[in-house]
């Protein structure tokens, strides 16, 4: 039995390919492929291209979300990969993200969300 409700990766990616960070169609495909890789269920994807550069996007999942915000001028991307349930693995999404953005360094904050005391959960 799960001792927590969800797994949440907060990702800091530096030294990314600036062209990939500014490629809105590529980012949308990366989000969709990330959802498939981690075993989640896609509800919808929304992206937005900024002028003169940069993008933001979110994949809304039945199990939570994957979100990205890019800064091509710094070679930087900030991402959240938050999944709930035993059947999902956010680290599988990270493999897809790494392949597309090609970061030179990655900082990962790995959170367990909805921690349950002794494996039980009670709403008050």
Swiss-Prot record:
Assembly and oligomerization: Heterotetramer of two alpha and two beta chains arranged as a dimer of alpha/beta heterodimers.
Family: Belongs to the prokaryotic AdoMetDC family. Type 1 subfamily.
GO biological process annotation, one example: spermidine biosynthetic process
Residues annotated with Pyruvic acid (Ser) modification: 64
pH-activity profile: Optimum pH is 6-8.
Protein name in the entry: S-adenosylmethionine decarboxylase proenzyme
Chain's gene name: speH
Keyword list, A-Z: Autocatalytic cleavage, Decarboxylase, Lyase, Polyamine biosynthesis, Pyruvate, S-adenosyl-L-methionine, Schiff base, Spermidine biosynthesis, Zymogen
Cofactor comment text: Binds 1 pyruvoyl group covalently per subunit.
Site (Cleavage (non-hydrolytic)): 63-64
Database matches in SUPFAM superfamilies: S-adenosylmethionine decarboxylase (SSF56276)
Temperature and thermostability: Optimum temperature is superior to 90 degrees Celsius. Thermostable. Retains full activity after 3 hours at 70 degrees Celsius.
Function, as annotated: Catalyzes the decarboxylation of S-adenosylmethionine to S-adenosylmethioninamine (dcAdoMet), the propylamine donor required for the synthesis of the polyamines spermine and spermidine from the diamine putrescine.
Species lineage: Archaea, Methanobacteriati, Methanobacteriota, Methanomada group, Methanococci
């Amino acid at each position: 039995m799960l001792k927590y409700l969800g797994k949440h990766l907060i990702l800091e990616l530096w030294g990314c390919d600036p062209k990939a960070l500014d490629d809105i169609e590529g980012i949308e495909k990366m989000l969709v492929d990330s959802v498939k890789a981690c075993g989640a269920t896609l509800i919808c994807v929304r992206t937005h291209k900024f002028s003169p550069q940069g993008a933001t996007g979110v994949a809304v999942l039945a199990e939570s979300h994957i979100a990205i915000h890019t800064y091509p001028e710094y070679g930087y991307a900030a991402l959240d990969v938050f999944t709930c349930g035993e059947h999902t693995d956010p680290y599988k999404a990270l493999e897809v993200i790494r392949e597309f953005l090609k970061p030179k360094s990655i900082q990962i904050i790995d959170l367990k969300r909805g921690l349950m005391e002794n494996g039980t959960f009670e709403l008050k």
